[in-house]
Every structure is written in C-alpha cells, then in structure tokens.
C-alpha cells in the first residue's frame, strides 16, 4: 500500500518497511498542519521563495471555485491520473498546505493508508485533521471519508469529535453555501488575515462584485447594488469587532437556512443618513437627546428625580406596609362586585379585540418576513455567482420552514376571533371599520406573497372574492332579482346529522378554490404546503373575515369607514379642533349629569393598587417597563391570556344548565312515598337515602304551600370595606355612595320609608349602603292540601316539607308572598334525598292564588346563561366561516 507513496525527502524512495522517515514526515506535516490550521495558505518552508509562497497563497484563496464547477469530474479522474502520473508526496503536501482542498483530501487518504500498516492512532489523527480542512472548503469526498472515520472511530478525539460530527452532518446545500462563503470571505479579506475587523470587511465589500477584469465602467446595476447592501448588512449584523473565516461561514449558513439575526431587521438601508442614525436615545449626548427626543429626556429627568426622592424613604415604607396584601384585597373587592352577566358581556369583547390586534401584529410580521424573503433571494443570487450548484429551491424551503411562527400565531388568532365574534355584542364592535381594515389587509397580504406560485394565488384570490360577493348578493337591499339568484342556494343535501351540502354557484367556486389549495400544496413535492399554501391562508382568512363582518355592517358605516377616513387625512387640523371641542363639551355634560365627587373617589380607589405598585418599588422605571414590553413577544402574551380566559370559561360551559325544561313525571306524592316518613319507618333513613340517590338529577315542577322564608346570608362587600376605614371617613363614604335615612314627616307615603325613618334614631350612622346588599334565602314549602280542601294529617306532616335555596334575584317575589300561598316551583333533585327537610335550589317560582300579580312578572325564573347553546352557536359560526357556502352546519 505504501509503495506508491513518495518519500518526504528528495534523496530517493526508501524501502516501504522503513518507518522512521515516514514517521518524521508525518510529525512534520502534523506540526505544520496545527500551525496553519486557520491561517490562509502560504509557503511553509523558510528556504522557499517568499514571492512564490505569496503567489501560491493568493491563488489558493479563490481555490474553492475549482471544485465547485468540476469537483465530481476531478474526483472521477483522480484514479486514472494516479495510475498515469505519479505526483511526489512532497508536492501534494505543499499544495495541501497552500490550501488546495483536493490535495488536502489526498494527504488525508495517504495517512489513512499508512494507518492500516503502522502507528494507527497517530496516522488516523493526522488524516482526520487534513480531512477536516478539506471538508471545510466543501470537498464532498473529504466529508464521506470523515463519515467513515466517525463510524469506525478512527482518529476521533475529544478535541475534534464535535467538529467532525458537524461537518459530517452537513447537507449538500450547506456544503455549497460553505464553498461560496469561503470565496466571498477571501474577497473581503484580500490580505489573508486570520481575523478581519468589521470595518475593514465593509471597506472591501465592493470587491466582491468586481469581475475578473476589474471594475466595469458605467452605472452599477440595481441587482449588484442590492447584493452589495445585503452583504454590508450581513457583515455588520455580527456583534463581534473581528470576524474570522469560521464565523463568516457559519453566519452565511444560518442566513441561508432562514435563521436571520434580529438586529439585521433594525438596520436602515438608507446610506445618506447622518452619523446619529440608528442610535437609541440613551446613546445620544444630552444636548442632542433634548433636541431630538424631548419627551424621552423629560421622562428620564422625571424618573431620576423620583428615584432620588423616593429611594431613601420608600424603601423602609415598602418593608412595613403589606402592599401585596392590600393589592390583593382591593382586587378581590372589585371582582366580588362584578356579576356573571358582566363577564358574559365583557369577556367575548376582550377576546375579540385582543385576537384581532394579534391578527394585525402577525400580519405585519408576515410583511416583515416578505422583506426578509427579498433579502434572502438577493443573498442566494450572490451565492450562485460563486457556487452554481447551490440548490436554491431547497434553500427557499428551509427558509420558509424556519419562518412559520408568525403564520401559526396568525391562525391561532383567527380561531379566537371566529369563536368570540358571534358571542360579542355587535353594538360594541365597529363592524364597518373592521370590514375596511380586513379588506385592506386582504389586498396587502396578497401583494406580499411569493411570485413562484402566482398563477394559483391569483386565481384563488379571484375565486374567493367572486364567491364572497355572490354570497353577499342576497343581503343587498337593492331589488336585483336576477343577480340575487346567482348567490342563492338551489337545493341542500344533508350529509349526516350535523352537516348540510349547499348546491349553488358559490359552492362550485369553493370547490375550485379547494382544488387550487391542493395544487399550491402539491408544489415542490408537497413542500409548497408551508412555502405557498400557509402564506396564502393569511390572505384567505382576511378575505373571509371581511365578508363575515360586511354582513354586520351598514351602508352608511362603510361610507364613513372608507371615504370618511380618507378625507379625514386632508381635514385633519380642523377635525382635531372640532373633535377636541366636542369631546370637551360631552365630557363636561357627563360630569354635570353625574356626581363629580363620587367619580373622583371611585377613580382614586381603583388607582390605589397601581399607586402602591409605583411608589413602593424604589427601582421602578417607566422606560424600563416599556423596554421590557417591547422585548417580549406581544403576540405570544396575547395568545397565552386568551387561552387562559377560554380555559377559565370552559368550566362554566361544562357546568351550565341553561333554560332547560323541568318536566319530570315524578310527583311530590311519589317522592314522599319513596323517600318520606313511611319509607323511614319501613326500613331506616340511611337505607332510604341510598335508594333515593337514584332519583338525583330529576328536573321537577311541583305545587306546594308557602310556609315561610328567611334570610340565611347578607353579603355587602362595600360595607365591609368601609367599616375598616376611620369613623368620620366611613360616614362620609356611606353618604357618598349610599342613601340617607329619611325623616319621619307627614309627607312620607312609602311603607319602606316609614319603616326606615323609625330606625333613624336607633341607627349608628346617618346613612346606609343597603342597596349593595346581596341576600340568600331559604323557603320552606309544605305539601298541598287535598282536592276537597281538607287538611289531612299526612299532608300537614312537617317532615315532608322541603327547603328551597333562593338567590337575591328572587327577593321581590319572596317578600310579597304570604303564609299559605299556593306556589308552583321548579327545582332539581340533588343533595340529601331521602332525609328530613332536603334542600334544593330554586329555579323558578310563581304564585297560583295571589290576589295581586307578582312584580315584575307572574313567573320568575332564575337567570341562567345557556352557555352550551351559546358555544354551539359559536361552533356553527366557525364551521360556516371556513366551509360556507360549500358546507354549512345544521
């Protein structure tokens, strides 16, 4: 195997068994390899001509281009050339030291052959070291040999294992990018330094675009200008002051894979800006900061004064005042005074607006990524000049895969918008304005799409818009009978129990639209799913949302939202003055119609937690808070909060009862026979309770005799909070938020006022806040008498009585009932069935023999939100949003 190996010295070929010259040559080569591992190529021996060494080094700098165009052919011809012409090993070694990747590969193969005969460990390590250098220049044969060495654990040490694994795992795309990046780096570094300053690289950017014959006369083409600006931003995006070869190669590889440095987006492309462009306000001198950022300077001075004034005194105050407990108490006090109806109104609106804002933010991020796409294509065009074998299609696929995050967040935001829109109050949603915004983003998102799938995206958008307009025709107030027929459903076909197929012209258009979706996904061997289809879904969702919101809009609102806001830009000064004047008048009228003192006190109370938070943190900074918010991902924060809100509300949906029918055939007499005193006497109460537990869940409507009602609990969180205040402040708050006791004058005609005036002398305070009381009642109901009106012993048995729990909403009804009134009530059998005086929750009540009708209605039903039907309606709306007019939910 060693017979073909040339001797390391020119004295003559030694016999193959002689190991000493070979070992000496291996050691010399290894030592020179370690010295020149990072250095650019140069002559390794001191007796060589320096000029020759320099020419060899400079010739080796663009050497990676040679294996780019004909690397495969050279590899295929390597065998025959060796057979025909024997090249001395010293000459191959000199070429390898000069940076020739082919020679480095041959030296590595030579040491691998030597490792089979003697000194396996030393020769294998030398071979791996040479193969690493060749693989770094994109030599495919060297990569294959490294993979074999890694599999056989030949020459693999703890120092080179990580590098060998990285080079062995590189794809063809990464290897091509590496070869092109090597050529660019040596053009940017003509002096062949180990590390180059960023400023020096920026000065040499122009040399990359120069042809072999030097700079071409005439204007520079726009494509070359874009490539030059792209290369400048790529170099200056590195945070280091000096860039080595490996750093530049890794940076280029990451960009080619779609991993873009964050500060690359923040760089300005305008080359004519002054030296202060791009600097933050903190980096500017005080004079320029005041001139350029006056608000920031004022805020910074205010923060400094607050910090100086508060650090000394507020530090010890924050240690003795339980601020967190106070914040929690005030928070729970506010929450305890809110009702379920308020949450049912407020939460869908919050979810809708937050998710809509998230959609807008994600769309803007998509627009930013479209700019990144343009820069990426500029870089690939630049790399193609140095590596024609670069797989641009695979590079674009990798870039698209690594930039799917804003699209995923956008689709999640769409889900929240779809589910919250049918639940939210349309009176609090500016549908016309949102429809115009949705239409605007439909057009702009389409314009930001890639041109690679333009035939499909253009046809898909036209089809979608046509289907949407045809679906809107039946709702147009104008009498266009012939046109409305185009949007009407011809007939429907049930598909299962929950889905209906609508046969219409828009339905056919949607079938064609789904076909176009499939064609877009089919591009590039179904890699077009995330390269073309997912980006187009942004345009699709905005278009669908605009159609849905247009159904809730008015013609006047659309005119106001489109033409009015366009004219608003031209009449901005006059409109601002008019709006300010109108707002001032309305604000003054609002204050005159309400109690000014009450509003101010309420505002102060609600702001207490915020004030405590600000003043107890000695190191609090407004600008720091703003910076932290800008650094965090607002979209992720919104999505996390929306998910938490929906999970919290899901428990109410799961437990909701709604307006269900209380029509069980179980009568009170049957219940008393099975679970009453007779059953207790036959067996015992425990056995009866176990047996009657099978009746749990029955929704019954029974008739009984009202015996009495009592208050079991009075909840007044406002009074509890006021009682903790000093006496004089508490009385003032009671009179501010409550009512004064009436005086006992002859003009009082109300019974309630007469009762209160008698308590005025006995009350501890001049005012009361009983209007905030919330009551819980217990009603005792007995079995009705017989049909003849006679009272039987069993019917008057108090052990058969049942107890009904009632909430504060039944207060007016219960206070008007009298003992012996015949009432009809609805409840659910649950709890201690089969025991004495079982307690059920009152769901509905009506009086059957009252002389006057109960106020405000004859039958009073417990207000319960039918959350399940509401969620069912939201699911139906979501299904129709995606599939109507092709399919619709039953």
From Swiss-Prot:
The modification N-acetylmethionine is found at residue 1. Keywords: Acetylation, Cytoplasmic vesicle, Endoplasmic reticulum, Glycoprotein, Membrane, Phosphoprotein, Transmembrane, Transmembrane helix. The modification Phosphoserine is found at residues 32, 158. The chain crosses the membrane at residues 314-334, 340-360, 402-422, 427-447, 465-485, 496-516, 529-549, 563-583, 589-609, 632-652, 870-890. Highly expressed in the developing lens. Its main location: endoplasmic reticulum. Glycans are attached at residues 663, 748. It is a multi-pass membrane protein. It is found in: Endoplasmic reticulum membrane; Cytoplasmic vesicle, Secretory vesicle. Residues 1-83, 208-227 are annotated as: Disordered. Residues 50-67 have a biased composition (Low complexity). The modification Phosphothreonine is found at residue 30. Residues 1-20 have a biased composition (Pro residues). Residues 71-83 have a biased composition (Basic and acidic residues). GO terms for biological process: calcium ion homeostasis; endoplasmic reticulum calcium ion homeostasis; endoplasmic reticulum unfolded protein response; ER overload response; ERAD pathway; glucose homeostasis; kidney development; negative regulation of apoptotic process. GO terms for molecular function: ATPase binding; calcium-dependent protein binding; calmodulin binding; DNA-binding transcription factor binding; proteasome binding; protein carrier chaperone; ubiquitin protein ligase binding. Residues 1-323 are annotated as: Interaction with ATP6V1A. Residues 653-869 are lumenal. PANTHER family: WOLFRAMIN. Interacts with ATP6V1A. Participates in the regulation of cellular Ca(2+) homeostasis, at least partly, by modulating the filling state of the endoplasmic reticulum Ca(2+) store. Negatively regulates the ER stress response and positively regulates the stability of V-ATPase subunits ATP6V1A and ATP1B1 by preventing their degradation through an unknown proteasome-independent mechanism. This is Wolframin. The lineage of its organism: Eukaryota, Metazoa, Chordata, Craniata, Vertebrata.
